[in-house]
Amino acid sequence: MEWWASSPLRLWLLLFLLPSAQGRQKESGSKWKVFIDQINRSLENYEPCSSQNCSCYHGVIEEDLTPFRGGISRKMMAEVVRRKLGTHYQITKNRLYRENDCMFPSRCSGVEHFILEVIGRLPDMEMVINVRDYPQVPKWMEPAIPVFSFSKTSEYHDIMYPAWTFWEGGPAVWPIYPTGLGRWDLFREDLVRSAAQWPWKKKNSTAYFRGSRTSPERDPLILLSRKNPKLVDAEYTKNQAWKSMKDTLGKPAAKDVHLVDHCKYKYLFNFRGVAASFRFKHLFLCGSLVFHVGDEWLEFFYPQLKPWVHYIPVKTDLSNVQELLQFVKANDDVAQEIAERGSQFIRNHLQMDDITCYWENLLSEYSKFLSYNVTRRKGYDQIIPKMLKTEL
């Protein structure tokens, strides 16, 4: 073999193949240049937010309350209550009162937990809190009226609040979550443990999704999975509305999968449901790369999560999903960095203290726009912390 080391043939082959290899590298780099440039621009423009006093989300509160800077009158509030756009609450003398009716008691209980956490520092006020899935105040409605909702699009004036699901009343998924997903602080710990068991290098590189067909926007991913199962593993599960295989695109429903078991996969998909999806925040804590489909529906913390910085944005019709998956597979280090930034953001800025802090800041700012003194309504029940309810 010594002749090969100094052979003119070897030199000729090296000179012949080197330009070809360089060309392939250049071609590969240029193929993904649009995505790489987009990531670099997004990182250059990104300003990390402070962890102090949940100030990360102050801009959301300011924007949501802007329509009410002219003041909220007693007459306006009476109209909101009359129209039954949500559950009416009053705070007087650091006590919380509520009308008798609540459409979803566990959801109201989840909301009340956080208000009671900060009740001692809140001024008198009253508000209507919508615990339905859908926002109530479209922008074409004039004048804007104050209704609190957990999720909305840019077409609504609703005031976003941290959803009840951070404490209780989350979506029940039979049989794995029969009473809902449970407390966010405890679920965080489970997901972080699972992420540690499945570091990036051990994760399956097939894209993954399990969920019910709450929106047909999910259909293209399911169909892509059936066509190319090595690229995507996506199946529909049952929900309460399931009646036949028509509701799962002609195939039997898949078994539900615990969210902690999603951490085995590098690429996880988040879609809107009826409104914003409750799974979004959970997926990040797997340390996986989140593919977020569409950008219309928001919860209060969404605006600080930035595309290309914390997650991969996907067009609503999924027309670019195959190209995006090919990109992250070809640029594994880049994909891992985005996944790590997304995970760190949720770990650092969406702790339970941040939720409580947001509630306090939101209600304190909102109360400044009430142009009248609140009078407690007769017949309203005082809401007492659950730990005290065993006294009787």
UniProtKB/Swiss-Prot annotation:
The active site is at residue 133. GO terms for cellular component: endomembrane system; endoplasmic reticulum; endoplasmic reticulum lumen. Changing residue 169 to E: Loss of O-glucosyltransferase activity. Pfam families: Glyco_transf_90 (PF05686). Disulfide bonds join 49-56, 54-357, 102-108, 263-286. Its EC number is 2.4.1.376, 2.4.2.63. SMART domains: CAP10 (SM00672). GO terms for molecular function: EGF-domain serine glucosyltransferase activity; EGF-domain serine xylosyltransferase activity; glucosyltransferase activity; UDP-glucosyltransferase activity; UDP-xylosyltransferase activity. UDP-alpha-D-glucose binds at residues 177, 212, 218, 274-279. The keyword Nuclease does not apply. It is found in: Endoplasmic reticulum lumen. Residues 103-107, 172-178 are annotated as: Interaction with the consensus sequence C-X-S-X-[PA]-C in peptide substrates. The record marks 132, 240 as: Interaction with the consensus sequence C-X-S-X-[PA]-C in peptide substrates. Glycans are attached at residues 40, 53, 204, 373. One of its GO terms (biological process) is regulation of gastrulation. A motif (Prevents secretion from ER) lies at residues 389-392. Its main location: endoplasmic reticulum. Keywords: Developmental protein, Disease variant, Disulfide bond, Endoplasmic reticulum, Gastrulation, Glycoprotein, Glycosyltransferase, Limb-girdle muscular dystrophy, Signal, Transferase. Pathway: Protein modification; protein glycosylation. Belongs to the glycosyltransferase 90 family. This is Protein O-glucosyltransferase 1. It comes from Homo sapiens (Human). The lineage of its organism: Eukaryota, Metazoa, Chordata, Craniata, Vertebrata. The gene is POGLUT1.
